[in-house]
From Swiss-Prot:
Its EC number is 1.2.1.38. CDD domains: AGPR_1_C, AGPR_1_N. Catalyzes the NADPH-dependent reduction of N-acetyl-5-glutamyl phosphate to yield N-acetyl-L-glutamate 5-semialdehyde. It holds the Pfam family Semialdhyde_dh. The active site is at 149. GO terms for cellular component: cytoplasm. One of its GO terms (molecular function) is N-acetyl-gamma-glutamyl-phosphate reductase activity. It comes from Methanococcus maripaludis (strain C6 / ATCC BAA-1332). This is N-acetyl-gamma-glutamyl-phosphate reductase. It is an enzyme of class 1 (oxidoreductase). PANTHER family: N-ACETYL-GAMMA-GLUTAMYL-PHOSPHATE REDUCTASE, CHLOROPLASTIC-RELATED (PTHR32338:SF10), N-ACETYL-GAMMA-GLUTAMYL-PHOSPHATE REDUCTASE, CHLOROPLASTIC-RELATED-RELATED (PTHR32338).
Length: 343
């Protein structure tokens, strides 16, 4: 039995890690940290996991990273905080999955420009943890940068077309997310009266996930692409629906495109290709699946592909556990084999 610590256990990603790890047969959570809630019972703060595993016996702790000695650490801290923690764990030889944006960029200047932070804890061996593209690298690394929620759905929606050089350099992603993507701390943006019965775009051309999507697709296509991304906030709790647009470089049919996607993802349990019907948020709610469908081509050669993920699972904590399973040599599906909550 491998041991786990969760640094930053009061947010939504920490909560989801606890929920999902309660179904994992090969790990036990020993430490959940929180400076603010230190000394309080875990299940008083997270009553949804009461009576699961050893959670009734756990209290939040304020532990310095130097004093953590578990096999795996999930770092569920805000951007900027992880860079002070992860290098210490890295030096101790602990397997770390960081859910912040601090280690997603090989180009540190790009990170500093988009996040407005000076990076003080660079780890050159950190690997971008999108298993469908980087599984072999993940297996060999002890520091994994868990992808962002929007980039996960966006990259997976277009990866087969980019890898096969079937679309031109212009790719547009239109994503709509549930409110939980904004985090556990309430704001005017996420206040119920402002979100309910409403829909709006934000950070229309300058969301920090834009360069993350772009650099991964650039790598996959081995060329510089012109990636545009605009997010919207939906009046729902969970889920991201991404509509991807580009223009085909060749005269291929919808059937050809579907065949390309099925071949590209044939060994990927967590990617489901829908030839017919629409992918939906309810279909992936609570799951680690990315559902991909659409594949429609208009009279101008524009192809539209649609993906759906749960932003807190495949877009965060579920993918983090998937990465843990890979680096620890567990079955990749362990703790994650659950279907969507539909309706």
């Amino acid at each position: 039995m491998k041991t786990v610590s969760i640094i930053g256990g009061t947010g939504y990603t920490g909560s989801e890690l606890l929920r999902l790890l309660s179904n994992h047969d090969n790990v036990e959570v020993l430490n959940v940290t929180s400076r603010k809630e230190a000394g309080k019972k875990l299940t008083d703060f997270h009553p949804q996991v009461r009576n699961l595993r050893n959670y009734n016996d756990l209290e939040f702790q304020n532990i310095a990273p130097e004093d953590i000695d578990t096999d795996i650490v999930f770092c569920a801290t805000p951007h900027g905080a992880s860079m002070a923690i992860v290098p210490i764990l890295h030096e101790k030889g602990i397997n770390v999955i960081d859910l912040s944006g601090d280690y997603r960029f090989e180009d540190i200047e790009m990170y500093e420009s988009w996040y407005g932070l000076k990076h003080t804890g660079i780890i050159e061996s950190a690997v971008y943890g999108l298993p469908e593209l980087h599984r072999e690298k993940i297996k060999k690394s002890k520091t994994i940068a868990n992808p962002g929620c929007y980039p996960t759905g966006a990259i997976l929606s277009m990866a087969p077309l980019v890898a096969n050089d079937l679309v031109d350099e212009r790719i547009i992603f239109d994503s709509k997310s549930g409110v939980s993507g904004a985090g556990v701390v309430a704001s005017q943006t996420t206040h119920f009266p402002n979100v309910n019965e409403n829909l709006g775009a934000y950070k229309i051309t300058n969301h920090r996930h834009s360069p993350e999507i772009g650099k991964e697709l650039d790598y996959l296509g081995n060329k510089k692409l012109k990636v545009s991304f605009t997010p919207h906030l939906l009046p729902v709790t969970r889920g991201i629906l991404t509509t991807a647009h580009s223009y085909l470089k060749e005269d291929v049919s919808r059937a050809d495109v579907i065949e390309i996607y099925e071949e590209f993802y044939k060994d990927e349990f967590f990617v489901r290709i829908f030839e017919e019907g629409m992918v939906s948020l309810t279909g992936v709610r609570g799951t680690n699946f990315c559902d991909i469908g659409g594949f429609e081509i208009d009279q101008h050669g524009r192809i539209v592909v649609i993906s759906a993920i749960d932003n807190l699972v495949k877009g965060a904590s579920g993918q983090a556990i998937q990465n843990m399973n890979i680096i620890m040599g567990f079955d990749e599906k362990e703790g994650l084999s659950v279907g969507g909550m539909r309706p």
